Curated annotation (Swiss-Prot):
GO MF: phosphate:acyl-[acyl carrier protein] acyltransferase activity
Protein name: Phosphate acyltransferase
GO cellular component: cytoplasm
Pfam families: FA_synthesis (PF02504)
Function: Catalyzes the reversible formation of acyl-phosphate (acyl-PO(4)) from acyl-[acyl-carrier-protein] (acyl-ACP). This enzyme utilizes acyl-ACP as fatty acyl donor, but not acyl-CoA.
Natural source organism: Neorickettsia sennetsu (strain ATCC VR-367 / Miyayama) (Ehrlichia sennetsu)
Keyword flag Transferase: yes
Pathway(s) the chain acts in: Lipid metabolism; phospholipid metabolism
Gene of this entry: plsX
């Protein structure tokens, strides 16, 4: 127990995601190989399926750093929230519950986003004064990093919710990126005040009228402003944010494949590719969504990290890394201290 006590204890929903449980458990192995003796996994899912995966040579070293907790039910990708929360024997439900009971310090799931948000909200509870949780992460820009929320937890948001997201995103930027006075903007189709939905325009006025100094509200931002590094935090509803994220990821993959293909068209291009290999690898790694996997569910009273539903082992390993970093840096407590200033 003392040995486990020195490690970050991570609850894994092994049955959530398109490639569960194989890629989930392989992802845990990948992370453990890269960070030996740093974590202990509590694996929630069908025990027979988990044991089958652990019998693989690729996962053999995981055996000494995990515990299997059987969960006979699974939250499916098309389950409605009302159905998912009733599946109290599911791997997702039991993994989140493990954090509430403080047996684990964080939970990671690649499963149904809406269900994960709802179950986390019910079991972990909301932070004081917060209406809804949001999925938050950082994206690379020309000048560094930008915090983006919401990325899919709430498809439709009122102006009051968007207003709170601004404070939550600012708190995350301060805690995770060390930005002292974040520049916060609302994502919109233009920068003119008369553009946008009613909720966005109302949120604009609420943020303009605030009297605190937690952050600097700079108005609206278009996607080009976001990736150009002109803003530290960008706020949107979950539908818009998720579309922007997935579009950016698909453009990256298109350009990556095109660049790689261009270096193989002739002998000269192959030589150029060899010369530029190190620089290209560095740039591609910075923008690779698989290496940036893992978004925090901010606003709940615990560390809950959502991985992409289609995560492979490398992507899921990075989601685990994101969760471990949140715990190790005590980011949730720092975020809580900052969020408490919301009216």
């Amino acid at each position: 127990m003392d040995q486990v006590g020195r490690k970050v204890v991570v609850a894994l929903d092994t049955m959530g995601g398109d490639r569960a449980p194989d890629e989930i458990l392989l992802g845990a192995s990948v992370y453990l190989r890269q960070n030996p003796s740093s974590v202990f996994f509590r694996l929630f899912g069908n025990s027979s399926s988990i044991e089958r995966c652990l019998s693989s040579k690729a996962n053999v070293h995981l055996l000494e750093s995990c515990e299997i907790i059987h969960a006979g039910d699974v939250v499916m990708s098309d389950d409605k929230l009302s159905s998912a929360v009733r599946k109290k024997g599911s791997s997702m439900y039991k993994a989140v519950q493990d954090v509430r009971e403080k047996a684990s310090q964080c939970v990671v799931s690649a499963g149904n986003t809406g269900a994960f948000m709802g179950i986390s909200k019910i079991l972990l509870g909301m932070l004081e004064n917060i209406y809804r949780p949001a999925i938050v992460t950082t994206l690379p820009t020309k000048k560094g990093e930008v915090v983006v929320l919401d990325l899919g937890a709430n498809l439709d948001c009122s102006s009051d919710v968007l207003y709170q997201f601004a404070f939550m995103g600012s708190a995350f930027a301060k805690a995770a990126l060390g930005v002292k006075n974040p520049r916060v903007a609302l994502l919109n189709v233009g920068v003119e005040e008369n553009k946008g939905t009613d909720a966005v325009k109302e949120a604009f006025h609420l943020l303009n009228e605030r009297t605190d100094e937690d952050f600097t509200f700079i108005g609206y931002a278009e996607p080009s402003d976001v990736l150009g590094g002109e803003v530290d935090v960008v706020v949107s509803d979950g539908f818009t944010g998720n579309v922007m994220l997935k579009t950016a990821e698909s453009i990256f993959r298109l350009l990556r494949d095109d660049i790689v293909g261009a270096t193989r068209t002739s002998l000269l291009s192959r030589l150029a590719g060899l010369v530029l290999a190190k620089s290209l690898k560095k740039s591609i790694s910075r923008f690779n969504p698989d290496l940036r996997n893992g978004a925090m569910l901010i606003g709940v009273n615990g560390v809950a990290v959502k991985a992409h539903g289609g995560s492979d082992s490398v992507a899921f390993a990075n989601a685990i890394g994101a969760a471990v970093k949140l715990v190790a840096n005590n980011l949730n407590s720092k975020i809580i201290d900052s969020i408490c200033t919301i009216d």
